[in-house]
């Protein structure tokens, strides 16, 4: 065999091995989503705190008092078999729960990271109070209380979507406790009010949220999160989220959702990015078009909203210690849409900062 043929042979073997490993790895990551989607009944009723839905890892509860109300914050604390000494806190988005981090959490744990994934107050398996003054500062205080309870004094804070806004606020409040900030398509990188969206009242949000069902959530996520794609593993998070809005207790879910939307819309983080003092990794799917209250916006300005191919770059210029990684063919949830590409970039970005 000549040298050129030998090189070609080695190249082909290497490519086949790479594809095999990649396929097996992808199967390992998305299998929990597919298995869950296959086992979930359509339009099931899961209760206002997802009482009827099982998470992929054991759930624990942190009990505390906030604004005079007894609270329970659900969380998963997943420890690796061989720890590398770093804890990563995963902060979910508005239409997500801690459970939707399952693929990322599994990947990180396999690489030696301790993973803590809470459901914020007002979300998923956590308390949904009848009255609560929602601010990102309050959610930051709650998250710090949880981490203090768990003895975690220094962590990588990783937030997706609305969780990205919370992660930024947390880093601004407690920079000494943040080893690194990881932002996955965070919202709040633009001021929707300043761009011309009229203020939606809490009552308007509430009426809209009462109409939440799996079909509506699926259609929105298909167009915004997954660039028109839909695969089997995308369905489980839809059924989980929509299941809170079915049956008894749906009103308190919708009411808390309305209050949270009001918080997101009125508290953009855009103006404070320059104040961040921690290393920041931006992981941005550039096909994302998410903009809070876009459906309330005048038709002529909607194309100007949620342009993440521009928002990611603009944020990276504002943040002093920013590293930007863009995924050109992915949308709002790159960690679910393409876990292989996402996790590879994530691991390089985290380990490269150490």
Locate the predicted segments by residue.
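An N-terminal hydrophobic leader/cap segment in hydrolases
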Residues: 33, 37-64
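Active-site loop/oxyanion-hole signature of alpha/beta-hydrolase fold enzymes
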Residues: 63-69, 76-81, 110, 120-158, ...
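Conserved HGGG/HGGXW glycine-rich cap/lid loop of the alpha/beta-hydrolase fold
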Residues: 67, 71, 78-125, 345
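Alpha/beta-hydrolase-fold catalytic nucleophile elbow
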Residues: 119, 184-187, 283
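Flexible "cap/lid" loop of the alpha/beta hydrolase fold
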Residues: 168, 172, 181-211
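Conserved alpha/beta-hydrolase catalytic His-Asp/Glu region
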Residues: 213-273
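Conserved serine/cysteine hydrolase catalytic core
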Residues: 246-312, 317
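Catalytic active-site module of serine/aspartate enzymes centered on a nucleophile-bearing elbow/loop
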Residues: 309-354
């Amino acid at each position: 065999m000549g040298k050129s043929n030998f090189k070609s042979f080695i190249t082909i073997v290497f490519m086949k091995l790479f594809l095999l490993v990649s396929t097996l790895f992808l199967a390992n990551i998305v299998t929990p989503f597919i298995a869950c989607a296959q086992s979930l009944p359509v339009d099931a009723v899961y209760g206002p705190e997802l009482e009827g839905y099982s998470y992929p890892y054991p759930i624990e509860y942190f009990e505390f008092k906030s604004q005079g109300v007894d609270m329970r914050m659900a969380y998963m604390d997943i420890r690796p078999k061989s720890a590398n000494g770093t804890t990563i806190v995963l902060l979910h988005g508005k239409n997500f729960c801690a459970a939707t981090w399952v693929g990322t959490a599994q990947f990180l744990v396999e690489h030696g990271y301790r993973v803590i994934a809470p459901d914020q107050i007002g979300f998923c398996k956590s308390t949904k109070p009848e009255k609560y003054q929602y601010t990102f500062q309050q959610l930051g205080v709650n998250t710090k209380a949880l981490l203090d309870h768990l003895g975690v004094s220094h962590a990588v804070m990783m937030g997706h979507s609305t969780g990205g806004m919370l992660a930024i606020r947390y880093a601004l409040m407690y920079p000494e406790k943040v080893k690194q900030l990881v932002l996955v398509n965070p919202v709040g990188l633009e001021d929707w009010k300043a761009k011309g969206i009229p203020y939606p009242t809490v009552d308007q949000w509430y009426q809209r949220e009462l109409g939440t069902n799996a079909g509506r959530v699926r259609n929105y996520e298909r167009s915004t999160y997954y660039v028109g794609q839909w695969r089997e593993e995308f369905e489980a998070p839809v059924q989980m989220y929509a299941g809170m809005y079915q049956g008894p207790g749906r009103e308190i879910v919708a009411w808390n959702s309305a209050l949270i939307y009001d918080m997101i819309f009125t508290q953009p983080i855009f103006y404070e990015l320059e104040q961040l003092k921690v290393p920041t990794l931006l992981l941005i799917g550039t096909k994302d078009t998410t903009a809070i209250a876009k459906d309330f916006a005048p038709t002529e300005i909607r194309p100007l909203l949620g342009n993440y191919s521009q928002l990611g770059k603009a944020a990276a210029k504002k943040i002093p210690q920013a590293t930007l990684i863009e995924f050109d063919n992915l949308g709002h949830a790159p960690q679910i849409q393409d876990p292989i590409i996402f996790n590879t970039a994530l691991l390089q970005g985290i380990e490269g900062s150490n």
